[in-house]
Amino acid sequence: MSGDGEDELCRNALALVNELCFSVRGNHNNEKCIEFSYLLRDRDRTRHIETDISVSLLSVIVTFCGIVLLGVSLFVSWKLCWIPWRDKGLNPQRRDSQHHPHQHLHHHHSHFTDLTVERVDCGPEMPERSYLDLESYPESGIKLSQTSPDIPVDTSSGSKENNIPNAHSQQQVSAPPPATRFNSLPRPIPQQLSSPEFGTQADEKVEQVTSIGQIKPELYKQRSIDTEAKKHQKVNCGRINFMLRYTYTTEQLVVKILKALDLPAKDANGFSDPYVKIYLLPDRKKKFQTKVHRKTLNPIFNETFQFNVPFNELQNRKLHFSVYDFDRFSRHDLIGQVVLDNLLEFSDFSEDTTIWRDILEATSEKADLGEINFSLCYLPTAGRLTITIIKATNLKAMDLTGFSDPYVKASLICDERRLKKRKTSIKKNTLNPVYNEALVFDIPNENMEHVNVIIAVMDYDCIGHNEVIGMCRVGNATDGPGREHWNEMLANPRKPIEQWHQLIEEKVMNSYMTKSFAAGTGATKPVTIVVESPHSV
């Protein structure tokens, strides 16, 4: 049985016994009933006492909390009100005591005839020289600054001939604090003034200086030379180790990138995510790229690449290495580069030749995003534009594996609006995808002059947003290869016109389109090319 039930049963039993004892006549004098009545009174008295104790304990707690809150409020008010008021009351006296000498000094600057100098008893009584009294230093020169020459003071002519007070010159003198600071007051050095060399030096300075503030070219010549030397000096950004071998039978140049050492840190964690791009100059038709190595400054690659180069062209070819730092959500940072020329010298080695080269810092390099090859074909009678995406080469690596998952998206733009979009399939883990896929748009013949097409190469990501690798544009309102390709298509209807296009960055295209539209280029109404952001896919 629960506690509440037992209490209720006890109350009922007590009420019943009370009724039996005092309701029936003759039981008032019964000893048992009288004893029971005393027990009831004691029980009620105990209950009242417990109630009083609980009430008194609660009042004590409330009183204590009130006292604590009162003390905290008094302490806070003392901190906020009393201390600032006390400091405010004491500040005027401190300011008067601290700044009185300076105020006295500035007060007398406008009245130079009333300038007084305090004296110090240091043995025999000697006149104390004021730091504003130039006549006390008849043979010394005025020092305007650390770089300006010393100007001797002419006591005879002085400032009387020019009607200029001495105080104007004195304000420019690099002087120490006033005369009240006895120990810090500079004194003329007798040895320097009395030495025979001092007079000759002063005469030379008088001949060299013709006016105050004259610039000495020799002071800045050395700095300019150092600056030019720093500009021409290239910073070493580590070293790279690779092997070369030329096979005469197949006319192939075999390059094996072994490792790199002491690369600079490009990330906030003190490391880099390096990879190497390699290609032959000057055409750059074929480019290779190593895998990305995470969080290291001494990557080990051990990757081999082959270039088909005839033997008679080795002398005019150069091998170009570019070391990059991989960034997932921004442009890759160029760490440095190495150019190996005169490859004919290394063709004499039939076996692998290990070569070490210093990686030199490169200030900037044009973004190499790759190229795309597609054809345009328009049928005027059907009003149909067919864009055949053939392939892309040398795309930028967007994944840590050193590859990308590219697909191509074509957007049809007219009057600042995207009308339609088409896209190809996704090619996994490649930088040279081959598509051969046709993207068809229905465009009336009269609207061909008002449309543009954006070709964007995207990198597909399973998790997150797809990113733009690079893009190009074709249409009547474009410039360069895009406009030439479009005009050639219109001049040759029902015939596919194939052409290669260089991919550019999204921000570069947007800035160029903004400038061209502001200048009003193009024969037709300017059409804003809206490049679809990867966040909208």
Curated annotation (Swiss-Prot):
Gene3D superfamilies in UniProt: C2 domain
Chain ranges on the Vesicular side, renumbered to this chain: 1-52
Highest rank taxon of the organism: Eukaryota
TM helices/strands, residue ranges: 53-78
A single MF term (Gene Ontology): SNARE binding
Family annotation (SUPFAM superfamilies): C2 domain (Calcium/lipid-binding domain, CaLB)
Region listing for Disordered, in residue ranges: 92-111, 142-200
Pfam annotation, one family: C2
Binding positions for Ca(2+) 4 per the UniProt entry: D399, D405, D459, D461
Topology versus the membrane: Single-pass membrane protein
Subcellular localization: Cytoplasmic vesicle, Secretory vesicle, Synaptic vesicle membrane; Synapse
UniProt cofactor note: Binds 3 Ca(2+) ions per subunit. The ions are bound to the C2 domains.
Swiss-Prot/TrEMBL keywords: Calcium, Cytoplasmic vesicle, Membrane, Metal-binding, Repeat, Synapse, Transmembrane, Transmembrane helix
Biological role: May have a regulatory role in the membrane interactions during trafficking of synaptic vesicles at the active zone of the synapse. It binds acidic phospholipids with a specificity that requires the presence of both an acidic head group and a diacyl backbone.
Subunit structure of this chain's protein: Homodimer or homotrimer (possible).
Entry protein name: Synaptotagmin-C
